[in-house]
Amino acid sequence: MKHNVKLMAMTAVLSSVLVLSGCGAMSTAIKKRNLEVKTQMSETIWLEPSSQKTVYLQIKNTSDKDMSGLQAKVTKAVQDKGYTITSSPDSAHYWIQANVLKADKMDLRTAQGFLSQGYEGAIAGAALGAGITGYNSSSAGATLGVGLAAGLVGMAADAMVEDINYTMVTDIQISEKTTASVQTDNVAALKQGTSGYKVQTSTQTGNQHKYQTRIVSSANKVNLKFEEAKPVLEDQLAKSVANIL
């Protein structure tokens, strides 16, 4: 009879810990099952209304990811707004220059949140389950094994369900032709050795107003792969760039 009671207790502990340890993974899988995309711009750019609809594009990528489809998507998005793409910067009314600085996997959670809801949570749950059911010396060892085994199962479940966020950071410069003469003062501090700087200044006169902003696009989904995130990140950037015009 006593043996049956211990067996039932260990079975109950195992079931409870398995359920609790899998809650975090299951919750993440449900909440993040659909791809969510968000794009933000650091600064608003206001362009003067103009009947001139020619645009020169210069799209660069200095990240370590392949973004080879970006140029074509930006071109199409701009054309869909009624603008003509030209290969001549001199004849274009607008210049759009973009550089993808970073396209990488980033976790939406803070570091502490990741630890407390990930592996740390599973191990803590295992120890808690073992402590509660270790009600006498004869069963404590066996129940400890059950609790730790359940915790390891929970860790495996958390490892299989990962909340993934890919973020693309792009710097944008828009140049707009104007009939006025625009004077630009350039100042650059160049590092000299380990303790010195050389300051260079120059002044130039042109016919363009220049505006700069940064666009941050994020794609979030459980177990997201970059191959799935890439096209939507490119689409979001192309849409944002075209909407500046």
Swiss-Prot record:
Tell me how this protein sits in the membrane: Lipid-anchor
User: Where mainly located?
Assistant: membrane
Tell me the domain of life. Bacteria
**Which residues form the lipid moiety-binding region (N-palmitoyl cysteine)?**
C23
User: Residue positions of S-diacylglycerol cysteine lipidation?
Assistant: C23
Location in the cell reads: Cell outer membrane
Asked if the Swiss-Prot or TrEMBL record annotates the protein with the keyword Signal, the reply is yes
Q: Which residues form the signal peptide?
A: 1-22
* Coiled coil spans: none
An example of a Pfam family matching this protein is TraT
InterPro entries this protein is in? TraT_complement-R
Q: Which UniProt keywords apply?
A: Cell outer membrane, Conjugation, Lipoprotein, Membrane, Palmitate, Plasmid, Signal
One Gene Ontology CC term in the entry: cell outer membrane
Q: Which family does it belong to?
A: Belongs to the TraT lipoprotein family.
Q: What does this protein do?
A: Responsible for preventing unproductive conjugation between bacteria carrying like plasmids.
For this entry, the protein name equals TraT complement resistance protein
Name of the gene this protein is made from: traT
